[in-house]
Swiss-Prot record:
Organism encoding this protein: Severe acute respiratory syndrome coronavirus 2 (2019-nCoV)
Mutation effect (residue 11 to K): In strain: Mu/B.1.621
Compartments, as annotated in UniProt: Secreted
PROSITE patterns recorded: SARS_ORF8_IG
Record's keyword annotation contains Signal: yes
Mutagenesis or variant effect for residue 24 to L: Partial loss of hIL-17RC binding
Listed name of the protein: ORF8 protein
MF annotations from Gene Ontology: cytokine activity; identical protein binding
General function of this protein: Plays a role in modulating the host immune response. May act as a secreted virokine by mimicking interleukin-17A (IL17A), and thereby binding to the IL17RA receptor, leading to activation of the IL17 pathway and increased secretion of pro-inflammatory factors. Contributes to the cytokine storm during SARS-CoV-2 infection when secreted by unconventional pathway. May act by down-regulating major histocompability complex class I (MHC-I) at cell surface. May inhibit expression of some members of the IFN-stimulated gene (ISG) family including hosts IGF2BP1/ZBP1, MX1 and MX2, and DHX58.
Other notes: Similar to some Bat coronavirus ns8 genes, but is entirely different from SARS ns8a or Ns8b. Elicits strong specific antibody response.
Substitution effect: residue 11 to I: In strain: Iota/B.1.526
Signal peptide region: 1-15
Post-translational modifications: Glycosylated by the host when secreted via the conventional pathway. The glycosylated form cannot bind IL17A and would not participate in the cytokine storm.
Effect noted on mutating residue 42 to H: Complete loss of hIL-17RA binding
Phylogenetic lineage: Viruses, Riboviria, Orthornavirae, Pisuviricota, Pisoniviricetes
């Protein structure tokens, strides 16, 4: 029993600490981004402005009355197409990099960020 608990913790930690996700899409076409967060985790999508891990994040979706809607920014253009499922126009973010924040908790008190790198077909 102790071994199963230990194995569960190791599996969760290993899955939770993914740093980067590489995905392929056709440039300037709508693309449903694969969520790299582990199953049963919550996710929020951002653009990280700058290269540092401590760089500010721009949220791409907002919760409105039980549904998620894309936030449109002048500097980003129409990058986010839909939030459920998370869909973007396949292009490099103008201000930085695409990041998904994964958390087991709905309030995101503990989280881990995964950078999503797009490979254009």
């Amino acid at each position: 029993m102790k071994f199963l608990v230990f194995l569960g913790i190791i599996t969760t930690v290993a899955a939770f600490h993914q740093e980067c996700s590489l995905q392929s899409c056709t440039q300037h076409q709508p693309y449903v981004v694969d969520d790299p967060c582990p199953i049963h985790f919550y996710s929020k999508w951002y653009i990280r402005v700058g290269a540092r891990k401590s760089a500010p994040l721009i949220e791409l979706c907002v919760d409105e009355a039980g549904s998620k809607s894309p936030i449109q920014y002048i500097d980003i253009g129409n990058y986010t197409v839909s939030c459920l499922p998370f869909t973007i126009n396949c292009q490099e973010p103008k201000l930085g990099s695409l990041v998904v924040r994964c958390s087991f908790y709905e309030d995101f008190l503990e989280y881990h960020d995964v950078r999503v790198v797009l490979d254009f077909i």
